């Protein structure tokens, strides 16, 4: 039986100086009422200062609903730093500064990260008499996660969704959804094998739209938000479509969606969305379309079933927006990829390699800037490499009447009855194309009765050269390759590589 896991994760801050009028206790009380009403097993993650000075430990000791879980939201604040004997990297006069160098562990030296973890764990233990299974933040570096695994044996962690620039956090190119065992050298990437991984499942948060979040336009605060966050998602239709996209066509063992909201938005702003989402979640559970598990229990399930990160696919056949697009995601411990359909056209909009030689920027040194970046190794980067609003997507071209044209496909089908593979077939006047995503490769075959090729847009700052059996790239000093087969020849322009398919052969990429 394939698992359809939902985790309700509410995280709790003591205060937010940007909105002093917010009642931070009210959202927790109201969320707790709804969770108790539906008897959901939820997870509550507290900032360290919320445990120190807030009413929350006493509240939870008194009123925590049965089956609920307490854990730590490891954002750093001034009070937390004082308890740890560490210098706070935030602005003068504030307790919590959301900027990367202040609120994330990456803003502190390794010895300071240890002190911050120790202080938080000690305070949690003093308040509740045990150590938590679940510790999360918008981003936790691999060194800190490794320490939490080795000393405190946590069973689950989580980080922010895939996004570029939002709130100054660019967490991009990694495992797009679900969970993975992080690399010991880069928390944004899965470990390639048991020796190179931290054995703590890391879950992606916030319930992103698999169709529209990836290429959501950039604004002053980074990308827009196309997620399940209750302050943004108040439409039951949008939520139902998300659930059908995430859970309706499972090609791999499981899927995962996180619900919940931090208290610092205030109850009036989140009320309508939160009430609606809990009601819709209850309906989905009653219909067997989802099940609710705490973050810690989700981690225990993952640990008991997988020694290494398993593949995870998302088949999103419905677009909540009028454009009517479709999207397909495939993640493995070696790469991630996303295929998109617009009208009669198919294109690969994303392909990132996961190579454990690629170390995260803040593994040994600290972040000194307001904005952080955690990324992967790009091969296809449809969003960030776009020009004049045109995505830099990889496309198929077929020879038709003496010229190269993008083929059109009228019908599309997905085979989900496979063993952790994602197989897509589309047919039209130019023939039939087959895409197959497996743990270690991407296969493309066009049955058109005519020559065909692949057009791969490249970034000259990253692309190095094309050979019949491999593509070579370099990003942030890391040289990496994508293997090729089924190619009869290559050509290069200023903006793209042309890969000519050998007659009668399928083309394989080996990230």
Locate each region found by the language model.
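Catalytic domains of cell-wall/extracellular-matrix polysaccharide-remodeling enzymes
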Residues: 109-183, 440-445
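Metal-dependent polysaccharide deacetylase catalytic core of the NodB/CE4 family, i.e.
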Residues: 48-139, 195-226, 252-265, 374-375, ...
């Amino acid at each position: 039986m394939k698992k359809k896991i939902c985790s309700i994760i509410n995280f709790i801050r003591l205060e937010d100086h940007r909105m002093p009028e917010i009642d931070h206790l009210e959202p927790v009380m109201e969320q707790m009422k709804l969770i108790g009403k539906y008897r959901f097993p939820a997870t509550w993650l507290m900032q360290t200062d919320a445990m120190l000075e807030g009413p929350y430990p006493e509240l939870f000791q008194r009123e925590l609903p049965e089956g609920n879980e307490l854990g730590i939201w490891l954002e750093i604040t001034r009070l937390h730093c004082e308890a740890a004997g560490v210098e706070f990297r935030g602005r003068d006069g504030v307790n919590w500064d959301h900027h990367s160098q202040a609120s994330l562990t990456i803003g502190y030296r390794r010895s300071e990260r240890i002190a911050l973890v120790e202080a938080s764990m000690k305070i949690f233990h003093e308040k509740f008499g045990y150590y938590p299974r679940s510790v999360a933040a918008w981003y936790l570096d691999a060194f800190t996660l490794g320490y939490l695994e080795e000393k405190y044996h946590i069973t689950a962690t989580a980080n922010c969704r895939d996004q570029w620039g939002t709130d100054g956090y660019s967490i991009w190119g990694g495992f797009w959804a679900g969970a993975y065992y992080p690399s010991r050298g880069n928390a944004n990437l899965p470990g390639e094998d048991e020796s190179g991984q931290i054995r703590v499942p890391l879950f992606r948060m916030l319930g992103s739209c698999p169709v529209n979040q990836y290429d959501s336009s950039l604004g002053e605060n980074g990308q827009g938000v196309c997620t399940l966050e209750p302050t943004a998602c108040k439409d039951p239709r949008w939520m139902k479509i998300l659930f059908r996209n995430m859970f309706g066509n499972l090609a791999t063992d499981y899927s995962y969606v996180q619900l919940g909201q931090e208290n610092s938005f205030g109850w009036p702003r989140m009320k309508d969305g939160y009430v609606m989402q809990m009601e819709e979640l209850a309906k989905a559970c009653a219909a067997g379309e989802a099940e609710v598990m705490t973050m810690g229990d989700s981690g225990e399930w993952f640990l008991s079933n997988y020694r290494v990160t398993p593949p995870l696919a998302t088949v999103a056949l419905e677009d909540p927006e009028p454009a009517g697009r479709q999207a397909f995601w495939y993640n493995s411990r070696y790469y991630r990829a996303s295929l998109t359909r617009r009208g009669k056209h198919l294109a690969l909009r994303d392909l990132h390699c996961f190579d454990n030689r690629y170390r995260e920027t803040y593994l040994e040194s600290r972040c000194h800037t307001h904005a952080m970046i955690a990324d992967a190794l790009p091969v296809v980067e449809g969003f960030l490499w776009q020009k004049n609003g045109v995505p830099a997507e990889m496309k198929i071209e077929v020879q038709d009447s003496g010229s190269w044209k993008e083929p059109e496909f009228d019908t599309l089908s997905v085979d989900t009855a496979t063993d952790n593979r994602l197989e897509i077939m589309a047919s039209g006047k130019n023939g039939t194309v087959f895409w197959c995503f497996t743990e270690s490769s991407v296969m493309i075959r066009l049955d058109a009765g005519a020559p065909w090729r692949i057009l791969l847009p490249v970034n000259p700052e990253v692309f190095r050269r094309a050979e019949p059996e491999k593509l070579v790239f370099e990003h942030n000093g890391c040289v990496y390759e994508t293997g090729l087969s089924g190619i009869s020849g290559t050509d290069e322009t200023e903006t793209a590589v042309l890969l000519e398919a050998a007659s009668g052969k399928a083309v394989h990429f080996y990230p």
